[in-house]
């Protein structure tokens, strides 16, 4: 849904890196190189960005009661 601000495992701040990661990967760069450039070396932080799925736009169509 919404990218978490911190890594669930180690607590490192990762929320500020998501849009840069997304932009560069969509431009055709290798995700491994992008994560290295962003300073995400721990596999727990890397999985947070690699496995994230944007669902907020789909969920907003439903009403909350």
Curated annotation (Swiss-Prot):
Ranges annotated as spanning the membrane: none
- InterPro entries (alphabetical): RNA_pol_su_RPB10, RNA_pol_suN_Zn-BS, RPABC5/Rpb10
UniProt keyword list = Cytoplasm, DNA-directed RNA polymerase, Metal-binding, Nucleotidyltransferase, Transcription, Transferase, Zinc
E.C. numbers: 2.7.7.6
Q: Which terms does the record give in the GO molecular function aspect?
A: DNA binding; DNA-directed RNA polymerase activity; zinc ion binding
> Where is the protein localized?
Cytoplasm
What reaction is this protein's catalytic activity? Answer: RNA(n) + a ribonucleoside 5'-triphosphate = RNA(n+1) + diphosphate
| EC primary class | transferase
The primary site where this protein sits is cytoplasm
What GO cellular component is one of the record's annotations?
DNA-directed RNA polymerase complex
Task: Kindly list the positions annotated as binding Zn(2+).
Answer: 7, 10, 44-45
> Can you tell me which residues the record assigns to a coiled coil?
none
Q: How is the cofactor bound?
A: Binds 1 zinc ion.
The prosthetic group or cofactor this protein requires is: Zn(2+)
Matching Pfam families: RNA_pol_N
Provide a GO biological process annotation: DNA-templated transcription
User: What family is it from?
Assistant: Belongs to the archaeal Rpo10/eukaryotic RPB10 RNA polymerase subunit family.
Its subunit composition reads: Part of the RNA polymerase complex.
Q: What does this protein do?
A: DNA-dependent RNA polymerase (RNAP) catalyzes the transcription of DNA into RNA using the four ribonucleoside triphosphates as substrates.
Q: Supply the name of the protein.
A: DNA-directed RNA polymerase subunit Rpo10
* Source organism: Pyrococcus horikoshii (strain ATCC 700860 / DSM 12428 / JCM 9974 / NBRC 100139 / OT-3)
Q: What is the lineage of its organism?
A: Archaea, Methanobacteriati, Methanobacteriota, Thermococci, Thermococcales
The gene that this protein is the product of is rpo10
């Amino acid at each position: 849904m919404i990218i978490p601000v911190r890594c669930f495992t180690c607590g490192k701040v990762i929320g500020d890196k998501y849009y840069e990661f997304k932009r560069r990967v969509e431009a055709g760069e290798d995700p491994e190189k992008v994560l290295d450039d962003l300073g995400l070396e721990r596999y727990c932080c890397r999985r947070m960005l690699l496995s994230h799925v944007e669902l907020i736009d789909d969920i907003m169509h439903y009403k909350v009661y």
